[in-house]
Amino acid sequence: MKNIVLTGFMGSGKTTIGRLVAEKLNIDLVDTDSEIIKEFKLTIDQIFEIHGEKKFRECEKRVIERVSKLENVVISTGGGVVLDPENVNLLRKNGVIYFLYASPENILKRLKDDNTRPLLKNGDKLSNIIRLMNIRMPFYKNCDFEINTDILSPELAAEKIISIHMAKESKR
C-alpha cells in the first residue's frame, strides 16, 4: 500500500487525523515534526528561536528524504513541507498526499491557546494565518486530494481518507 501523507496548515488536524488513520489501518504513524524534534532534541519553537527557519527546513528535508522511503505508513508532515517541491516529489513517489484544509478562522480557534507556533508569534495571529495560507495555498492545491476539516470531525475525515485511499489502492 502506498503511504498516506497528510499535509496542511498548522491546526488543520494532521496529527490527530493521522493517528486515527494509522489506528484504523493498524499501521505506523510517522510525524515529521516529531522526527525533527528528536534530531535537534529541542521543541519546534526552540529550533526556530536558536537555529532559525532555514536550519529547520534543512532538517525537515533530511527527515522527508528518510521517511519517504518507508512503506505502508501514515506520514504527518509539517505545514510548510509543501514549499519545497523536492519534498513533495519525494513524498509522492511512495505516497498519496492529502491536503487537510481548515479555514483561517477555524485554525485560529484551534490554536488560540497555543503559543508554541513560531510563525504565529509576532503580530496578529489571524493576519499571520491568512498571510501564510495565501503563500502556501497554491502548493497545497497540488496535493492529490483535499479533505475539508472544517466540515468533518477528525473521525469522519479519517474515514474519508481511508475510503479514498483504499479505492485508489484497489485500482493499482
UniProtKB/Swiss-Prot annotation:
Cofactor(s) of this protein: Mg(2+)
**Reactions catalysed according to its record:** shikimate + ATP = 3-phosphoshikimate + ADP + H(+)
Please list the residues that bind Mg(2+). Answer: T15
Q: Where would you find this protein in the cell?
A: Cytoplasm
Q: Does the keyword Amino-acid biosynthesis apply?
A: yes
Per UniProt, ATP binds at: G11, S12, G13, K14, T15, T16, R117
Q: Which UniProt keywords are given for this protein, alphabetically ordered?
A: Amino-acid biosynthesis, Aromatic amino acid biosynthesis, ATP-binding, Cytoplasm, Kinase, Magnesium, Metal-binding, Nucleotide-binding, Transferase
Keyword Transferase assigned to the entry: answer is yes
Q: Which residues bind substrate?
A: D33, R57, G79, R136
Any one annotated GO CC term? cytosol
EC number(s) from the headed UniProt entry: 2.7.1.71
Q: Kindly state a single biological-process term from the GO annotations of this entry.
A: chorismate biosynthetic process
- Top EC class of this enzyme: transferase
**Any binding details for the cofactor?**
Binds 1 Mg(2+) ion per subunit.
**Which pathway does UniProt place it in?**
Metabolic intermediate biosynthesis; chorismate biosynthesis; chorismate from D-erythrose 4-phosphate and phosphoenolpyruvate: step 5/7
| Family annotation (InterPro entries) | P-loop_NTPase, Shikimate/glucono_kinase, Shikimate_kinase/TSH1, Shikimate_kinase_CS
| GO MF annotations in UniProt | ATP binding; magnesium ion binding; shikimate kinase activity
Q: How does it assemble?
A: Monomer.
What is its biological role? Catalyzes the specific phosphorylation of the 3-hydroxyl group of shikimic acid using ATP as a cosubstrate.
Belongs to which family? Answer: Belongs to the shikimate kinase family.
Instruction: Quote the PANTHER family the UniProt record gives.
Output: SHIKIMATE KINASE, SHIKIMATE KINASE 1, CHLOROPLASTIC
Q: What is this protein called?
A: Shikimate kinase
Query: Where does this protein come from, organism-wise?
Result: Caldicellulosiruptor saccharolyticus (strain ATCC 43494 / DSM 8903 / Tp8T 6331)
